[in-house]
Structure formats: C-alpha cells, structure tokens
Amino acid sequence: METIARHSQARSSAQKLRLVADLIRGKNIEHALNILTFCNKKASILVKKVLKSAISNAEHNHGSDINNLQVKKILIDEGPTMKRMMPRAKGRSDRILKRTSHITIVVSDSKVKDKKGRG
C-alpha cells in the first residue's frame, strides 16, 4: 500500500534538497533514516521529518509493518520565491531570492522494482 506525506513551502532551495533526496531514493526505511541522521546538511533534517510523517501515516492509516516499508518515490519541487531587497552603495539595491520547496515522499510496503530500458 502506498502512503504519501508532503511538506509545502519548506525554507530551503530545491537544489539543496535534491542532493539529500538522491541519497535515500529506493532505500528501505531503516537505512534511509540512518543516512539522514548522519548526513551533515540542513536539508536532511527537513527530509527526515517528512519521512517520519510518511512512516506514521502508513502505520496509522493502513496498518503497515514498518520493517517492510521502502521509499518508493521522493519528489522535490520548487515552491514560491520570496523576493527581498538588500541596500547597496549609492542608493542602489540588489534583489535577494529566498527560495522554498515542496517535499513529497511516497512509501510503499512492496519491493521497489528496477526500471530497465529496452534496447
């Protein structure tokens, strides 16, 4: 059974979050949590929170066994960008872009199948 957890407008850029997401895609839950615990990035804390939420959703809503869960899909999409101004010399200003992201994690209790190309 597939279970989804989302975090909208996470205060980190999609580029930084995708580095962490690539580490856990397709892994089983125990191994993924272990990777995120020892990953030395702020993005790993955000992804770990969403992953724990997905695990709780699977356990509560579908009665899934935690030991059989795997990260089936993890999507990092760009969210809205907050635009701020930074004063510069001679009355000018520069634009600062504060980027946000949407994190979506799908966990499944079935094995993740490898996609093999044809030809």
Curated annotation (Swiss-Prot):
GO molecular function: rRNA binding; structural constituent of ribosome
Cellular component GO terms held in the UniProt record: cytosolic large ribosomal subunit
Biological process annotations from GO: translation
Pfam families linked to this entry: Ribosomal_L22
Signal peptide coordinates: none
Function (record text): This protein binds specifically to 23S rRNA; its binding is stimulated by other ribosomal proteins, e.g. L4, L17, and L20. It is important during the early stages of 50S assembly. It makes multiple contacts with different domains of the 23S rRNA in the assembled 50S subunit and ribosome.
Family stated for the protein in its record: Belongs to the universal ribosomal protein uL22 family.
PANTHER family per the UniProt record, alphabetical: CHLOROPLAST 50S RIBOSOMAL PROTEIN L22-RELATED, LARGE RIBOSOMAL SUBUNIT PROTEIN UL22M
Protein name: Large ribosomal subunit protein uL22
Organism: Buchnera aphidicola subsp. Baizongia pistaciae (strain Bp)
